[in-house]
Amino acid sequence: MTAPHETMSFQAEVKQLLHLMIHSLYSNKEIFLRELVSNASDATDKLRFEAIANPSLLENDADLAIRIEADAKARTLKITDNGIGMSRDEAIRNLGTIARSGTKEFFQQLSGDQQKDAALIGQFGVGFYSAFIVADKVTVETRRAGLGAEEAVRWESTGDGEFTVDAIARAERGTTITLHLREGEDDFLSAWRLKSIIQKYSDHISLPIRMPKEVWDAEASTYKRTDEWESVNQASALWTRAKSDITDEQYTAFYQHIAHDNEAPLAWTHNRVEGRSEYTQLLYIPARAPFDLWDRNHKAGLKLYVKRVFIMDDAEQLLPGYLRWVKGVVDSADLPLNVSRELLQESRDVKAIREGCTKRVLSMLETLADSEDEAERAKYATFWQQFGQALKEGVGEDQANQERVAKLLRFASTHNDTAEQNVALAAYVGRMKEGQDKIYYVTADTWSAAKNSPHLEVFRKKGIEVLLLTDRVDEWMLSYLREFDGKELVSVARGDLDLGKLADEAEKAEQEKAEADWKDVIERARAVLAGKAKDVRVTLRLTESASCLVSDEGDMSGYLQRLLKQAGQKAPDAQPILELNPEHALVKKLRDLPEGEAFSDRLQVLFDQALLAEGGMLEDPAAYVQRVNKLLA
């Protein structure tokens, strides 16, 4: 039974999106053709894939192509593909709603910069709506492969918040999108203009894009259209061509197509691998992190082809999780055409591809990081700013390549008076003082908190460099990265901190004397802070601050405890050790105070100040304020 004519309303987010397209992206009008051609290409990829299991879907028409035709009299532009097509329900769902959950994020990402916003359209899978930038009415006629000719559908909208759906007859499988151009958009009726846009954005599309052939009419001094169709793009899969035949511009255009990104990539690698597994890889390092890099539902992974037949997007099994930001294509000669995601998990060939792709990406990063060319090193700095935290995950996730990943890590450090993470572990080791056999670091919520940590005072005094770690992933990473180049990584907030040869004999003697002189005060302090501090002791690691908190050997740091609690996870209740600076005026007064409220209040203030200095939260801020006020009175 033929479905009736229906008028339906767009989803609210689509209305908002249409308004954006029409009113905010007018200076990037030509992107509409890029997006519609990309969608048409995807439709043919889907048909190829479904036809593997059901060849009848090809309907005796295996010559897959995209046709673009302008009609100057009617002022229309048609984009036709003979791909998978859509059923009535699919047309309503795909063209009337935004299915994905990222709608809110899409609008939050909009910056007002038209070029950047235009790139987001493709990233969010809403490229179809860009047609309304140049058209005041859009008509879509489509029939899904496998359905009868009478089961085709016409979808139409003027972009005003509603669309109509009608049943029609259509002999051809696939989709035709007709754009009824707005006044002033006649530029897009020019064959030359359309060809230039196609060659700019879509030359790499692996199926032919055809337009009516035009020949020069000398009498009329103009080009005239013929009944023939000609291909206006290369129409071959870029990765199958020889590297020497591909320009940087073509590599960049292909990246922009698969990544839906207007920016050029930082680097790429293109290789044909032969051996146990035979495959071609074309991998890119983007210049900017996607908005949802840290979203659990983020779709990551490479495009997978088998013998040039598209199999799936987002084949996350081809790269480890810490490289989820890599874009590109893998074309395997060994995998079966009916490969499933489940089969990918178990395949030995996929394991070999994964290992090979991982090594290639790490090699690209090493080339940028170690380059003598300042521009290349600047690219690595850009990469690190965008993806450094993700790369740190590799220290724990990829034991086989841990050493290579560790060499690529960058940190802020007391060597530079800047929050920029630009210090490599190898550079730190190269600057170590004579007698130093450890790499020292401090963790904190912010660079300022790390730089001003009381734990750094003795290191500043001795001129010892300390790494300043402020990323949430750092504590987790350090649980796997115990040493580098034979040097142990040690937190300056450890209670059992041993400077080894960096501490002279006089300092050791002074420490022993202080412990003896303050024995009585320390015993009283331990009694006051019982249940709050694991221990109280004097220290010479402080030169300016009155007190600091340190963690006992084997205990979780206060910083990591806070991170776990913020993430809603249970953290072990490890009490810190309070260390007091015996040379500080606030601490010296403890010796003159008898047991009682005044002694207890001053000691509690010293504990709370140390907790605040390391970024901790007070259990009772009001009590702290009262104690401080007493001291100030």
From Swiss-Prot:
GO terms for cellular component: cytoplasm. CDD domains: HATPase_Hsp90-like. Residues 1-341 are annotated as: A. PROSITE patterns: HSP90. GO terms for molecular function: ATP binding; ATP hydrolysis activity; ATP-dependent protein folding chaperone; unfolded protein binding. Keywords: ATP-binding, Chaperone, Cytoplasm, Nucleotide-binding, Stress response. It is found in: Cytoplasm. InterPro entries: HATPase_C_sf (IPR036890), Heat_shock_protein_90_CS (IPR019805), HSP90_C (IPR037196), Hsp90_fam (IPR001404), Hsp90_N (IPR020575), Ribosomal_Su5_D2-typ_SF (IPR020568). Residues 342-562 are annotated as: B. The keyword ATP-binding applies. Residues 563-633 are annotated as: C. Molecular chaperone. Has ATPase activity. Belongs to the heat shock protein 90 family. Homodimer. HAMAP family: HSP90. This is Chaperone protein HtpG. It comes from Cupriavidus taiwanensis (strain DSM 17343 / BCRC 17206 / CCUG 44338 / CIP 107171 / LMG 19424 / R1) (Ralstonia taiwanensis (strain LMG 19424)).
